[in-house]
Amino acid sequence: MHIAVVGLSHRTAPVEVREKLSIPEQTMEESLQNLRNHEQVLEASILSTCNRLEIYTLVRNPDLGIAAVRDFLSGHSGLESRDLSPHLFTYHHDEAIAHLMRVTAGLDSLVLGEGQILSQVKKMMRLGQEHKSIGPILNRLLTQAVSTGKRVRSETNLSTGAVSVSSAAVELAQLKLGQSRGQDALVTLETEQIAVVGAGRMSRLLLQHLQAKGASGVVLLNRTIERASALATDFPNLPIQCRGLDDLDQCLSTCSLVFTSTAVDDPIIDANRLNALNRRSSLRLIDIGVPRNIASDVHEVSGVESHDVDDLQEVVERNQEARQQVAREAEGLLLEEGRLFLEWWDSLEAVPTINRLRASLEEIRVEELTKALSRMGPDFSARERKVVEALTKGMINKILHTPVTQLRSPQQRSERQQALQVVEKIFDLESGAATQD
């Protein structure tokens, strides 16, 4: 068995490719089931965010298992393998484990140290558990990855001052507005007429950062006004008008800055829509949705500037340099956590022998106990029988404790295999203990 990950991210694929592979939560169960239906895939878990899609698997054969995942991605995205392959990365076992640790710690994020990825990995684990696509191996790996992400954030300063995708989007708006005025600086948003489309987690973060950057008011649009209103109540100091998506054209006509972050299959803003409006001023659109909420043809519309998540790199680079040293400190923690998981993985090699040893001793215990109880006769009470039963079980557990602990303790594989062979021979257990390749 092997752990493997196949995926793509902002580092390997542009947003127009990433959006084709995005897997929304409502189709996650079907996607996980499709993966698990393949004979090579024993466990599967999917991480789908605006900047990455990664599929973690436990497979029988690494080459065949990875090929199955690649076929799934090609079928899901509608992209031919030759078009998709240049954007994919693949990591095997040790590298796959290390990659997940880096991702969860925020070291592989567009925004170094951002905290949202930790919640997204937690969600990946929860969905895998709910849909029964992960078993003991990936469950252990994901649990340790989440623990590692928390540890990195508590034991280093990586999360101090970290920006998120949403805060980077707001800073990008400030930067572009400043540049349009001849200033290479972040300017206040106080005079901008601002709209936010969507009322999910990303929109919540947008409102939080817009308020911090001086926005005097925001129009919040969503399919259901009730959800927008519920979100608005969390920002009593920021004037928010809640509207339905029916008012989107009006907002595009009157606002100077529009952020979009809503779950859609197709863009909700395109050139035809904008050209049909009677606009009198410039419009800046910032789209942090994946799949994209704004079509690429809006660049052709006069007076309109549009940016997507890939354009956030300009802001990110202004914040990254000072954080690189902290990231290097975090790498040491990741190496330690990765080693701990691999030690646990290696210890699984001993499980078949341990199970056979336990079964052999249990068979002896039951046989000898049965003989002893038959000699005690009918005068031996049920309570006394239970006491003797517990006594013999306790003795077996005491006898097994030290050898089992030693067999599963961290050690060189050759040493463990030698110890397993000795146990197999001494106790005359079945040969051919299963091993981890």
Swiss-Prot record:
NCBIfam families the record matches: hemA (TIGR01035), PRK00045.1-3 (NF000744)
Residue sites binding NADP(+) per the record: 198-203
Keywords annotated in UniProt: Chlorophyll biosynthesis, NADP, Oxidoreductase, Porphyrin biosynthesis
Site note Important for activity, residues: 99
GO biological process: chlorophyll biosynthetic process; protoporphyrinogen IX biosynthetic process
Catalytic activity: (S)-4-amino-5-oxopentanoate + tRNA(Glu) + NADP(+) = L-glutamyl-tRNA(Glu) + NADPH + H(+)
Active site positions, chain numbering: 50 (nucleophile)
CDD domains: NAD_bind_Glutamyl_tRNA_reduct (cd05213)
Note: During catalysis, the active site Cys acts as a nucleophile attacking the alpha-carbonyl group of tRNA-bound glutamate with the formation of a thioester intermediate between enzyme and glutamate, and the concomitant release of tRNA(Glu). The thioester intermediate is finally reduced by direct hydride transfer from NADPH, to form the product GSA.
Disulfide bonds: none
Protein name as it appears in the record: Glutamyl-tRNA reductase
UniProt family annotation: Belongs to the glutamyl-tRNA reductase family.
NADP is among the record's keywords: yes
Purpose: Catalyzes the NADPH-dependent reduction of glutamyl-tRNA(Glu) to glutamate 1-semialdehyde (GSA).
Pathway: Porphyrin-containing compound metabolism; protoporphyrin-IX biosynthesis; 5-aminolevulinate from L-glutamyl-tRNA(Glu): step 1/2; Porphyrin-containing compound metabolism; chlorophyll biosynthesis
Binding of substrate, residues: 49-52, 109, 114-116, 120
Broad enzyme group: oxidoreductase
Enzyme Commission (EC) number: 1.2.1.70
InterPro entries: 4pyrrol_synth_GluRdtase, 4pyrrol_synth_GluRdtase_dimer, 4pyrrol_synth_GluRdtase_N, GluRdtase_CS, GluRdtase_dimer_dom_sf, GluRdtase_N_sf, NAD(P)-bd_dom_sf, Shikm_DH/Glu-tRNA_Rdtase
MF term (GO), any: NADP binding
Keyword NADP in annotation: yes
Domain writeup: Possesses an unusual extended V-shaped dimeric structure with each monomer consisting of three distinct domains arranged along a curved 'spinal' alpha-helix. The N-terminal catalytic domain specifically recognizes the glutamate moiety of the substrate. The second domain is the NADPH-binding domain, and the third C-terminal domain is responsible for dimerization.
Subunit architecture: Homodimer.
